[in-house]
From Swiss-Prot:
SUPFAM superfamilies: Trm112p-like. PANTHER family: PROTEIN PREY, MITOCHONDRIAL, ZGC:162634. InterPro entries: Trm112-like (IPR005651). It comes from Bradyrhizobium diazoefficiens (strain JCM 10833 / BCRC 13528 / IAM 13628 / NBRC 14792 / USDA 110). It holds the Pfam family Trm112p. Belongs to the UPF0434 family. Coiled coil: none annotated. This is UPF0434 protein bsr0601. One of its GO terms (cellular component) is cytosol. It comes from the Bacteria.
Length: 65
């Protein structure tokens, strides 16, 4: 019998990435699978993904360098 292969969400639907933008700059976002975040390079913010749901609130975002 095979062991379960289920694991936490590790990717974002590419179609979702096409339509999501940074709420501050309206620029594109990049998915960081290791940290489960959507990165806005132009705003220097990382938006968390919790339970597979992107949290697109600037006050919830982490500042990045």
């Amino acid at each position: 019998m095979n062991a379960p292969t289920e694991r936490p969400e590790t990717s974002v639907d590419p179609k979702l990435l096409e339509i999501l933008v940074c709420p501050l700059t309206k620029g594109p976002l990049e998915f960081d699978s290791a940290k489960q975040e959507l990165i806005s390079r132009s705003a220097k913010l990382a938006y968390p993904i919790r339970d597979g749901i992107p949290i697109m609130l600037p006050e919830e975002a982490r500042k990045i360098d």
